[in-house]
Amino acid sequence: MSQIPVADLTEAQAVEDLERLADLLATHDIAYHQEDNPTVSDAEYDALKRRNLDIETRFPHLVRDNSPSMRVGATRAEQFAPVEHGVPMLSLDNAFSNDEAIEFDARVRRFLRISPSETVAYTAEPKIDGLSASLRYEKGVLVQGATRGDGRVGEDVTANLRTIADIPHRLKGSGWPDVIEVRGEVYVELAAFAAFNKAAEEAGQRTYANPRNFAAGSLRQIDPKISAQRPLRFFGYAWGLVSEGFADSQWGALERLAEWGFVTTAPPAQRVLNAQGLLDIYAQFEVLRPTLGFDIDGVVYKVDDLELQRRLGFVSRSPRWAIARKFPAQRARTVLEAIDLQVGRTGAITPVARLKPVTVGGVSVTNATLHNGDEIARLDVRVGDTVVIQRAGDVIPQIVEVALDARPDPAPPPYEFPHVCPCPLQTPLAREVTASGQESVVRRCTGEFACPFQRVEHLRHFVSRRAFDIEGLGEKQLQAFFEEGWITEPADIFKLARDAEKLAVLREREGYGETSVANLVKGIEARRTIGMDRMIYGLGARDIGETTSTVLARNFDRFEDLQAAAEAAARALPGETYLELSTAPGVGPKALDMLVEAGKGGVVADPWPQTDDLELKIGHAVPKLTKPARAALAQRYGTWDAFADGLVAAASGAPGDDYLHLAAIDGVGPVAAQSLARFFAEDHNRQKVANLVAELDIQPVAKPKTDTAVAGKTIVFTGSLEKMTRDEAKAQAEGLGAKVASSVSKKTDLVVAGPGAGSKLKTATDLGIQVMTEDEWLELVAG
């Protein structure tokens, strides 16, 4: 994704950014909502969402059907039954400054035509950092509970929610509607969270990164008995479907919810007037925040009058009558006691700050990320310094600055990044040089498979949930088996399951016994039969993620065929000179082909010797190049001779057909193709794979059908789908052999339009493309 300011983006760059933002935010949504394991901080996530919205605002005709601005949460997990919400559970727009809070008040007034001199009342509620839930009551009795899911369809977690003491099984008092969906937040108090993590760590069990993850993971347990053992709490402060009105204002509704047995919020919501009231209450909640005993990440402002809420209505995925004013990330000062280096499975070295324990937002922090050596140098952070750390609530805290006023005297020496890996082999570290000649910020251990730290990380990746997901083989057990030499590569895991001698030794060990060993063997044997997509992902090759693994598995009938294609591609990889030319600004695939073609003759004659204008010469030598490309090439090479030699060298280093075929697979591309080829080019990788394949029954994944009414066609879904989610529609179409696109073009074969279809429907009509309703689509694919 580009870092070009939105105001400077071309339309082509905007299309590319929106596509990458959609994929990136979808990945983060799944990590946050389904896996309870966020991968970025709230601030980083909000920045991505804001860039997406800014681009869409500047280019409204480029809004994608799968735009993050149209999405709430994530699709439900398959292990829970679906629950369709009577009224969608929408998210809120965010405000990050006083100016944006004031603008919210101004927007409300403009829409309702209320003058600045008139009063508008708001309720201000603390924004609880937990997991949203909806409770359906019929005649006062709790009949169903669900998570938010994607906002329209959530997960049925009724039995789990019944275990929370704050949730009444029967409403108190009287006057409640016959049917009401009460909505709120499941959360965990900080003290209870700390106590659970401490006990789990002592028992060698999984700990959680923060209270929000803990609450989500605890509620979304298959066994409600586990949820019952967790210290979950619930605040109820909103509603969805109701059979009849029960209040005239947000404030009155909170009072009724409290009468019926719900804890609304603590500290209690407050009613404020006009824009200044919004700012004042925000300041009050910010002061209270560290004292609450649970996490809040902002204040929610809602127009108090429910009739005004009705008139304001909704826009896209959020109400016009409410907004969340987010708090900045929490900060604290502490002492940097050491800098340790962690080694990833691909050899990437990540420096981690070891800190004197400090409490930030109620959570004890002892580690913080330093990202890379360049970041350490930029901050000039030194061991012994007092540093300012920032905790965004979701990921490992980071050091944001050094408190120079507190630097010891004499000052500690500047940190020198080690030149060798911290593993016992102490192999040298290296910084890769990109094709454009720039040095990577990441240092890597050059020991590769010989490095024991990398080997352990490879094994951890192999048994991870989205790879082989072997029950009973956690990180501690894996580390112990590696240190003993029992498991040094993936195939050893399956050999262990039938090694009677080792299993007998294991049964006698403390913490194992007959049952534990039996469960371990059962978990291993259950994964001897594995899908080809999981097999590919489990290998841990660089740049080969889950999505690419699935694409590869669908394009090859057997794993052996994939390996043969990758080995052939390794013999046809592009050379460095070709890659260098391909990274020149403005040089896209077509321009690259023209330049390489010009260099194939072995000599590129100077077309205009009488001038020194290199850009002009390049334009004559390769006439169809764009002006930006000519300028970039002139700047890169400097002289005609250097340019001509570069073309000849690039042509000689052009990739062969075997590589091009692999890279041309839709969803693979050059980066993944090169990484996969280089993985299988290594002798030790091929041996490791051969050992593993001998232990497994690798199953092909389901291929898209080719004999359906839509096979080979390009489909676009637009508008609201009422009988399935957009993800379900996409999966259905792809399973039937169709390709699903996000925008309508001359290449589109069919548009499925639901209510609210806009510009895509108009474009399809203008182009004469077939359009059908959702019901017609379902009838078509059923036949």
From Swiss-Prot:
Sequence positions that bind Zn(2+): C421, C423, C445, C451
Record-stated family: Belongs to the NAD-dependent DNA ligase family. LigA subfamily.
Active site residues of this protein: K127
Database matches in Gene3D superfamilies: 5' to 3' exonuclease, C-terminal subdomain, BRCT domain, DNA ligase/mRNA capping enzyme, Helix hairpin bin, Nucleic acid-binding proteins
Residue ranges of every copy of the BRCT domain listed in the record: 705-783
Binding-site residues for NAD(+), renumbered to this chain: D42, A43, E44, Y45, D46, S91, L92, E125, R148, E185, K302, K326
Coiled coil spans: none
GO BP terms in the entry: DNA repair; DNA replication
EC number: 6.5.1.2
Species of the source: Caulobacter vibrioides (strain NA1000 / CB15N)
Lineage, uppermost ranks: Bacteria, Pseudomonadati, Pseudomonadota, Alphaproteobacteria, Caulobacterales
Role this protein plays: DNA ligase that catalyzes the formation of phosphodiester linkages between 5'-phosphoryl and 3'-hydroxyl groups in double-stranded DNA using NAD as a coenzyme and as the energy source for the reaction. It is essential for DNA replication and repair of damaged DNA.
A GO cellular-component term linked to this record: cytosol
PROSITE patterns (UniProt xref): BRCT, DNA_LIGASE_N1, DNA_LIGASE_N2
Molecular-function GO terms, alphabetical: DNA ligase (NAD+) activity; metal ion binding
HAMAP family reported for this sequence: DNA_ligase_A (MF_01588)
Name of the protein in question: DNA ligase
InterPro entries referenced in this protein's UniProt entry, alphabetically: BRCT_dom, BRCT_dom_sf, DNA_ligase, DNA_ligase_AS, DNA_ligase_CS, DNAligase_adenylation, DNAligase_N, NA-bd_OB-fold
